[in-house]
């Protein structure tokens, strides 16, 4: 009988610990999703809130001819040139999904999402809709520390010329 009681108590303790961890990860994900919404809105408004990125943030994307990784100062320069010529519109509300730690497979507060973005060349009026996948990892302060995106960005933008 004592073994059964001890087993029940140990099981209850283990499940309560997991529940607290899950709750913390869920709260982190919710906060990080709010950060993502603010970043995407500021991007569409051509006024990116760069304070939401860590000073050490690393960007990794699929730009033809770009280095494997980009730093925040490089992204700022890319944005400046891009916003001078193009306008963007997000085609639907975002559906943020919880990301996972690639080593453990456990939810970790990171945010991933798929979306369509319409890009219009403001000089000639040509537009293209680009399907994009992005994921963002965050540090303990809730700032983006690792950003990756996948899309056919180079060909899509070239089609607007």
Language-model segments: residues:
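Sec-dependent signal peptide recognition
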Residues: 2-7
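C-terminal motif of bacterial Sec signal peptides marking the signal peptidase cleavage site
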Residues: 13-16
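C-terminal and inter-domain tail/linker signature
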Residues: 18-161
